[in-house]
């Protein structure tokens, strides 16, 4: 039943201790209740591409949507609104009142560990995409939490790094998506970032709170990122409403003490408590499930399949290799991702999916009569693949004593289906969460004979035994790695010769986080601990490549599907380079292209760009991001023409990592990172410097052809902030297939005395057309279409002059032009 309470009455009658309790979570995912005043606890939940629920370990399966950059690549407001609605429904099923998403940080560099979570390098596209999803989610009565405000654009030293950025770049690039969200969606919550901006942690910077609440007139609940509160007095006085997670580290008795010293006023406490009560009241109006459960409805699966296929970008299609015919007699499926799809990046985005469709199965469905030749070709993992399908009868036992303690008492047992686990939010009656031990035991039955490599990484301590023989010691001596939000060890490797079909008893003896012998700073300690055990048959790399080349040569067509996965793109660390995994993938692709380029399709899976040294020799390249539950089906729908590709790159694709605008100023150096590229992020930089890219921002091909009228009619011809202009063009499908085109409107200020980008995205429309169909399309501008941030005046400025309207099918392919005039220079603040 939905609870009701009167906020004014509650504030007037509860104690200061109750008010203080409201200002932090009660645990990892819940706010603090006040039962005597009918104030309930409400649940928040990750993540950016799905609703995990309250459990990292033994969680309830969930819908996994495509990653943020994939969703941005749809350029489809309505489809993204429907995606938000699905996330709202998933929250209700998981008993959650608040979704901790979406993410709208900027991809300054292709190396950002969480770059895949955000929508685009362009602030306008990112803001519009985020607003669309928020509107959909909140239409279900679920509060959305836009994050991370602001400048959390890298993982390296993210809690300590000081982002040095000009006021202009801060406003035009990094704050702009949040501003669009505030104007168009007004979500109920905002999450602060871990980092500093220009000398002060955002979470305790009064200027940042004044910006959203006074300048923008938007007053959401503001919560910290998890363990992202660093002070009591400064953060409370600045405007932070809710410290997460609980139990509080900086509030509670510390606020009491600060109030006694009159360092925090009673009125400030009331303001913070009121905002939390408003949040709880709004959230608790929606009836959510009392127990966490899944949905997995047919209509949800259909929507996720559409999201996946509509995000996929056809980068190259020489000789019209695609779509592939369905009467193929023999097809080669090559690559690490054929049978193990990359459905999401790592960290907060990771969850237990309802299912994950594979490209192997999807191709078999599309070509039921074809002979399929499958080869791995080259591995793409950075850590050995987790053991799942070869694991049986696996459980984890929990103890308050180590394995050396005789007759220790088992406090509980959980069944498991994989050899990866995180205990950060795990609860068990009697278990000492500060210090505990567990034992995973299970049966491992290899499907091939030979030497098997096992890899074990841990946050805590762990040893691997096979048939009671110690194979890996990750307890005695530990070396820091990047796993588990940067708190884990590197992967320690052991090996054993195994026989196919024979069952081996595997055992992991695990000690919780506080047993670790490593000392790490600057990383979030989520507690509980975690471990990951992977395994792989040791194979000869050259033989794998040779087998892949032979399969491609023998087949009518070959599909290579490879790329990155959450080993390479994840919260907690940044990518070390822009290359594909350095285990022979490029060599394998080149070998196949040497003999079968004319009949080979290359499908890349990654959330951000990768180098493609073989791109000029490939005839057909498809980029499919991280596609969620329906990854395999979505890719197959494109490859066989069931869906006409309409995705457009949400990121520029540089040829080389050294070409990207943040190359010289990315990682934290001396505790700070200089945003030296200023406003020239992404295509703004490449165009300003004349730097060639492999594929431009907004690029994406189709199986049909569109004709656009070369003249864009702009009306009114005189642009004012109160009455912005619109551009009208005609577009016709002159090809033989139904399809969609994205008309991208860029505005240029060629005669401005102020340094400006060559052009900037200021509007777009996605248009669906049947063969022969023609439509008139209106693309609407807003008052910011001509403006920039004037650092001297501290206001937005629209300069008088003539502006060009450039309508393209990518940032490089301009197909229609127009112009308008601003006859008077104007300034303004706010939204």
From Swiss-Prot:
All copies of domain PA14, residue ranges: 389-549
One GO BP: cellulose catabolic process
Catalysed reactions, semicolon-separated: Hydrolysis of terminal, non-reducing beta-D-glucosyl residues with release of beta-D-glucose
Major subcellular location class: secreted
Compartments it resides in: Secreted
Cross-referenced Pfam families: Fn3-like, Glyco_hydro_3, Glyco_hydro_3_C, PA14
Sugar-bearing residue positions: 13, 474, 514, 604, 629, 726, 823
Active-site residue numbers: 225
A cellular component term, taken from the record's GO annotations: extracellular region
EC number assigned by the record: 3.2.1.21
Coiled-coil residue spans: none
Family assignment from sequence similarity: Belongs to the glycosyl hydrolase 3 family.
Protein name: Probable beta-glucosidase H
Species whose genome carries this gene: Emericella nidulans (strain FGSC A4 / ATCC 38163 / CBS 112.46 / NRRL 194 / M139)
């Amino acid at each position: 039943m939905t609870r009701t309470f009167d906020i004014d009455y509650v504030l007037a009658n509860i104690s200061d201790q109750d008010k203080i309790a409201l200002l932090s979570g009660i645990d990892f995912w819940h706010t603090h209740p006040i039962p005597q005043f009918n104030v309930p606890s409400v649940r928040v939940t990750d993540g950016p591409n799905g609703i995990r629920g309250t459990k990292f370990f033994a969680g309830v399966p969930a819908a996994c949507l495509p990653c943020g950059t994939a969703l941005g690549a749809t350029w489809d407001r309505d489809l993204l609104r429907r995606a938000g609605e699905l996330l709202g429904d998933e929250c209700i099923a998981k008993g959650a009142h608040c979704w901790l998403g979406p993410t709208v940080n900027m991809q300054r560099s292709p190396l950002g560990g969480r770059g895949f979570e955000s929508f685009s390098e362009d602030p306008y596209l990112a803001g519009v995409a985020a607003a669309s999803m928020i509107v959909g989610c909140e239409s279900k009565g679920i509060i959305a939490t836009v994050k991370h405000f602001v400048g959390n654009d890298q993982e390296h030293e993210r809690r300590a790094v000081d982002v040095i950025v000009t006021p202009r770049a801060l406003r035009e690039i990094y704050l702009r998506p949040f501003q669009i969200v505030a104007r168009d969606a007004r979500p109920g919550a905002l999450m602060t970032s871990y980092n500093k901006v220009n000398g002060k942690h955002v979470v305790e910077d009064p200027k940042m709170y004044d910006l959203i609440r006074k300048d923008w007139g938007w007053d959401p609940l503001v919560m910290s990122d998890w363990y992202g509160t660093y002070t009591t007095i400064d953060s409370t006085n600045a405007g932070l409403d809710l410290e997460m997670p609980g139990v509080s580290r900086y509030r509670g008795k510390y606020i009491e003490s600060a109030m006694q010293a009159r360092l925090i006023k009673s009125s400030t406490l009331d303001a913070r408590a009121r905002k939390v009560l408003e949040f709880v009241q709004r959230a608790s109006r929606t009836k959510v499930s009392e127990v966490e459960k899944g949905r997995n409805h047919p209509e949800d699966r259909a929507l996720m399949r559409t999201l996946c296929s509509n995000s996929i970008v056809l980068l190259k299609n020489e000789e019209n290799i695609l779509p592939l015919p369905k009467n193929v007699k023999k097809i080669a499926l090559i690559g690490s991702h054929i049978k193990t799809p990359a459905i999401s990046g790592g960290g907060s985005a990771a969850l237990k999916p309802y299912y994950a469709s594979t490209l192997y199965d999807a191709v078999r469905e599309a070509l039921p009569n074809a002979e399929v030749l499958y080869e791995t070709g080259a591995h793409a993992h950075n850590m050995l693949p987790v053991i799942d399908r070869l694991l049986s009868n696996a459980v984890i036992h929990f103890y308050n004593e180590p394995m050396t303690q005789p007759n220790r008492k088992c406090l509980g047992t959980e069944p498991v289906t994989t050899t990866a686990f995180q205990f950060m939010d795990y609860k068990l009656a009697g278990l000492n969460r500060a210090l505990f031990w567990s034992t995973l035991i299970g049966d491992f039955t290899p499907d091939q004979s030979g030497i098997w490599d096992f890899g074990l990484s841990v946050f805590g301590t762990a040893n691997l035994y096979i048939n009671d023989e110690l194979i890996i010691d990750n307890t005695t001596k530990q070396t820091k790695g990047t796993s588990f939000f940067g708190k884990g060890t590197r992967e320690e490797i052991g090996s054993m010769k195994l026989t196919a079909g024979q069952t081996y008893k595997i055992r992991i003896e695990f000690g919780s986080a506080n047993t670790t012998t490593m000392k790490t700073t600057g990383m979030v300690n989520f507690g509980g601990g975690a471990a990951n055990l992977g395994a792989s048959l040791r194979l000869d790399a050259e033989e794998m490549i040779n087998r892949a080349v032979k399969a491609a040569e023998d087949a009518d067509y070959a599909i290579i599907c490879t790329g990155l996965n959450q080993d390479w793109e994840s919260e907690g660390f940044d990518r070390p380079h822009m290359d594909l995994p350095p285990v022979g993938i490029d060599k394998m692709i080149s070998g196949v292209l040497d003999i079968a380029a004319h009949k080979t399709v290359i499908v890349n899976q990654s959330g951000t760009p990768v180098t493609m040294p073989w791109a000029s020799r490939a005839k057909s390249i498809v980029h499919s991001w991280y596609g969620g539950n329906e990854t395999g089906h979505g890719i197959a729908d494109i490859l066989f023409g069931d869906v006409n590709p309409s995705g457009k790159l949400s990121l520029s694709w540089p040829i080389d990592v050294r070409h990207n605008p943040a190359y010289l100023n990315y990682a934290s150096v001396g505790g700070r990172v200089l945003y030296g590229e200023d406003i020239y992020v992404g295509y703004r930089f490449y165009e300003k410097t004349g730097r060639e890219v492999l594929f431009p921002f907004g690029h994406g091909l189709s199986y049909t052809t569109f004709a656009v009228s070369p003249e864009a009619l702009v009306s009114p011809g005189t642009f004012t902030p109160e009455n912005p202009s619109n551009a009208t063009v005609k577009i016709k499908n002159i090809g033989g297939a139904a399809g969609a085109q994205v008309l991208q409107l860029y505005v240029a200020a060629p005669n401005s005395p102020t340094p400006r980008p060559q052009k900037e995205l200021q509007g777009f429309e996605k248009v669906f057309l049947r063969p022969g169909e023609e439509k008139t399309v209106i693309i609407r501008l807003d008052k910011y279409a001509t403006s920039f941030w004037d650092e001297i005046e501290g206001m937005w400025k629209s300069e008088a002059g003539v502006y060009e309207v450039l309508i393209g099918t990518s940032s490089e392919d301009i197909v229609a032009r127009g112009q308008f005039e601003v006859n008077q220079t104007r300034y303004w603040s706010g939204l």
